[in-house]
From Swiss-Prot:
HAMAP family: HSP90. The lineage of its organism: Eukaryota, Metazoa, Chordata, Craniata, Vertebrata. The gene is HSP90AA1. Residues 9-236, 272-617 are annotated as: Interaction with NR3C1. It is an enzyme of class 3 (hydrolase). Homodimer. Identified in NR3C1/GCR steroid receptor-chaperone complexes formed at least by NR3C1, HSP90AA1 and a variety of proteins containing TPR repeats such as FKBP4, FKBP5, PPID, PPP5C or STIP1. Forms a complex containing HSP90AA1, TSC1 and TSC2; TSC1 is required to recruit TCS2 to the complex. The closed form interacts (via the middle domain and TPR repeat-binding motif) with co-chaperone TSC1 (via C-terminus). Interacts with TOM34. Interacts with TERT; the interaction, together with PTGES3, is required for correct assembly and stabilization of the TERT holoenzyme complex. The modification Phosphothreonine is found at residues 5, 7. This is Heat shock protein HSP 90-alpha. Residues 629-732 are annotated as: Interaction with NR1D1. The modification S-nitrosocysteine is found at residue 599.
């Protein structure tokens, strides 16, 4: 490979050299890379090899429709050439190359969208190894190089050289060196303390670690010495050449020459007499070794691949530092042929549900040729955490994004991928420990799938895990719940809320827990959306215990008692409804309360208190929806509670008792809070509570206080009793 080794000494003739300034953000990024200490500088080689691979992908892709593009060089490969004498490491590829405009734009004057984002990430403590994800991997060369020269030849342009020592500017000139044919050569002039990257062992280690599955041969060229047995004539020629090199050392040069001549004659005589006489000399040669002989892993038989190999491939594919959690390797044959390798990561990325960010988690190949890596049509959004490759035999190689959207083949591939992902999750669920890790990270995705994917809703519902009133610290499946249901239980009961403790202590679950009925605790906001779509499981309806019309398993005697209570408290319910007016739709006797005097439930198709809270938190909420979805509140009273019984007696004794009205409003507002709703006017409620505290402490309401401001506040407080003009209770909305 003489052309690669010679080009480090480019002849600097009088050709025109143009100087350009780096775009501000790029200059800033380079300064950051050069002036900050990073321990894992080795990633520069991964990034440059990755860029070479992309360039080779491009020329291969173009050659599929126009084979003449490869006339400038049929072989597609990457060569690595370390040169210890010149302290340079050269990366050569026979990819698409760059035109002069490409050189100027791509390497310096036009900032990539990721430049700023990467700098912000770096300053926030991100790892330098993430550089490739932001599209600025080339600049990682300056981690180890003081100067970088890029020589490139594109089919449509002349050969150009780009050079920069990162001082805020770079030069571009026509290159008059060795013609390349086509491709790009990146020459790194290494810093004095970075010569380890010229060592054969170190280069092999980095390529194996980061670039083992690159689809093109990566060949390392190393100059080595070996012993060679030669006859004395050849040895003499070799010695003569060495003498010429050492002409500066002239001391006693004549004597050895005379001796040599004599010895030569003697040797010739000996040689004629004894031809077996040989001599060993050191010979330099260039050793070529292909570093990535492993073929694309997804084309191999899954039975022949070890978990370590899958792990290595996963890391090279995703740049993840952790191993994958689970893997699915399969091929589909028949009318449609494709192979796929899918991985579940150990943890969810921090921006998993950022819609604006295009995910590039599944790479699409067609007959081993890379096509694209952010193909949104390949997998539904709720599975956007799955990483891997899909290699199709049937898609056309020159397929565009628009064609992909219409492609029936892609729809079939997508359907198969979803099916296999669900199989993978079901297999994972058999390993309790690993499934727990998976569920912690990706439960939201499963629930989003239930909301969005009606076809696979049943399978996805089997993957759900929840805490329940009977499960303690373990999460259980809906199937587990069904196996523990009581004989006469027809429904699956659930409650939604913010935390496990909050829902466990809720008034709504009192009677269910007393009767030994298990209640599912749904404590993630997405659960509200999930149960809107998941109406039933294995023929059992899912019923919210916070909504009206709760049916509990009860015998005839219990039903009779309940009817009697309804009749007894019918009058109180009517009085309370008249006092609360439009605040509630109706007041009824409850069958769900044990220790609480009352609670607020919502209509069957309205929002729960938790959903109302979630919707109020939406910045872009639709207030018209809020109006009709959140308005339907029902007050349920506990007929067995002493407060309610005393209130009934008080109301029946005197229908116009003002304290009844005050107490009903106080009960309603307290029930709102305990049922998870928010108060429209918390201050008035607070004043009412302070007044109750005063009564409890025996402080007379009319006592003048030392502080005038306190007196003013006291005057504003609504009295517990009084006529229509003075009672503020009536004004509370």
């Amino acid at each position: 490979m003489p052309e690669e080794t010679q080009t480090q000494d480019q002849p600097m003739e009088e050709e025109e050299v143009e100087t350009f300034a780096f775009q501000a953000e790029i200059a800033q990024l380079m300064s950051l890379i050069i002036n900050t200490f990073y321990s894992n500088k080795e990633i520069f080689l991964r990034e440059l090899i990755s860029n070479s691979s992309d360039a080779l992908d491009k020329i291969r892709y173009e050659s599929l429709t126009d084979p003449s593009k490869l006339d400038s060089g049929k072989e597609l490969h990457i060569n690595l050439i370390p040169n210890k004498q010149d302290r340079t490491l050269t990366i050569v590829d026979t990819g698409i190359g760059m035109t002069k405009a490409d050189l100027i734009n791509n390497l310096g004057t036009i900032a990539k969208s990721g430049t700023k984002a990467f700098m912000e990430a770096l300053q926030a403590g991100a790892d330098i190894s993430m550089i490739g994800q932001f599209g600025v991997g080339f600049y990682s060369a300056y981690l180890v190089a003081e100067k970088v020269t890029v020589i490139t030849k594109h089919n449509d342009d002349e050969q150009y050289a780009w050079e920069s020592s990162a001082g805020g500017s770079f030069t571009v000139r026509t290159d008059t060196g060795e013609p390349m044919g086509r491709g790009t050569k990146v020459i790194l002039h290494l810093k004095e303390d970075q010569t380890e990257y010229l060592e054969e062992r170190r280069i092999k280690e980095i390529v194996k670690k980061h670039s083992q599955f690159i689809g093109y041969p990566i060949t390392l060229f190393v100059e080595k010495e070996r012993d060679k047995e030669v006859s004395d004539d050849e040895a003499e020629e070799k010695e003569d050449k060495e003498e010429e090199k050492e002409k500066e050392e002239k001391e006693s040069e004549d004597k050895p020459e005379i001796e040599d001549v004599g010895s030569d004659e003697e040797e010739e005589e000996k040689k004629d007499g004894d031809k077996k006489k040989k001599k060993k000399i050191k010979e330099k040669y260039i050793d070529q070794e292909e570093l990535n002989k492993t073929k694309p892993i997804w084309t191999r038989n899954p039975d022949d691949i070890t978990n370590e190999e899958y792990g290595e491939f996963y890391k090279s594919l995703t740049n993840d530092w952790e191993d994958h959690l689970a893997v699915k390797h399969f091929s589909v044959e028949g009318q449609l042929e494709f192979r796929a390798l899918l991985f579940v990561p150990r943890r969810a990325p921090f921006d998993l549900f950022e819609n604006r960010k295009k995910k590039n988690n599944i790479k699409l190949y067609v007959r081993r040729v890379f096509i694209m890596d952010n193909c949104e049509e390949l997998i539904p959004e709720y599975l956007n955490f799955i990483r891997g490759v899909v290699d199709s035999e049937d898609l056309p190689l020159n397929i565009s994004r628009e064609m992909l959207q219409q492609s029936k083949i892609l729809k079939v591939i997508r359907k198969n991928l979803v099916k296999k992902c669900l199989e993978l999750f079901t297999e994972l669920a058999e390993d309790k420990e690993n499934y727990k890790k998976f569920y912690e990270q990706f439960s939201k995705n499963i629930k989003l799938g239930i909301h969005e994917d009606s076809q696979n809703r049943k399978k996805l519902s089997e993957l759900l895990r929840y805490y329940t009133s009977a499960s303690g610290d373990e999460m259980v499946s809906l199937k587990d719940y069904c196996t523990r249901m009581k004989e006469n239980q027809k429904h699956i009961y659930y409650i939604t809320g913010e935390t496990k403790d909050q829902v466990a202590n809720s008034a709504f679950v009192e009677r269910l827990r007393k009767h030994g009925l298990e209640v599912i605790y749904m404590i993630e906001p997405i659960d509200e959306y999930c149960v809107q779509q998941l109406k039933e499981f294995e023929g059992k309806t899912l019923v919210s215990v916070t909504k009206e019309g709760l049916e509990l398993p009860e015998d005839e005697e219990e039903k009779k008692k309940q009817e009697e209570k309804k009749t007894k408290f019918e009058n109180l319910c009517k009085i309370m409804k008249d006092i609360l007016e439009k605040k509630v739709e109706k007041v009824v006797v409850s069958n769900r309360l044990v220790t609480s005097p009352c609670c607020i439930v919502t209509s069957t198709y309205g929002w729960t208190a938790n959903m109302e809270r979630i919707m109020k938190a939406q910045a872009l909420r639709d207030n018209s929806t809020m109006g009709y979805m959140a308005a339907k509140k029902h007050l349920e009273i506990n007929p067995d509670h002493s407060i309610i019984e005393t209130l009934r007696q008080k109301a029946e004794a005197d229908k116009n008792d003002k304290s009844v009205k005050d107490l009903v409003i106080l009960l309603y507002e307290t029930a709102l809070l305990s049922s998870g709703f928010s108060l429209e006017d918390p201050q008035t409620h607070a004043n009412r509570i302070y007044r109750m505290i005063k009564l409890g402490l025996g402080i007379d309401e009319d006592d003048p206080t030392a502080d005038d401001t306190s007196a003013a506040v006291t005057e504003e407080m609504p009295p517990l009793e009084g006529d229509d003009d003075t009672s503020r209770m009536e004004e509370v909305d």
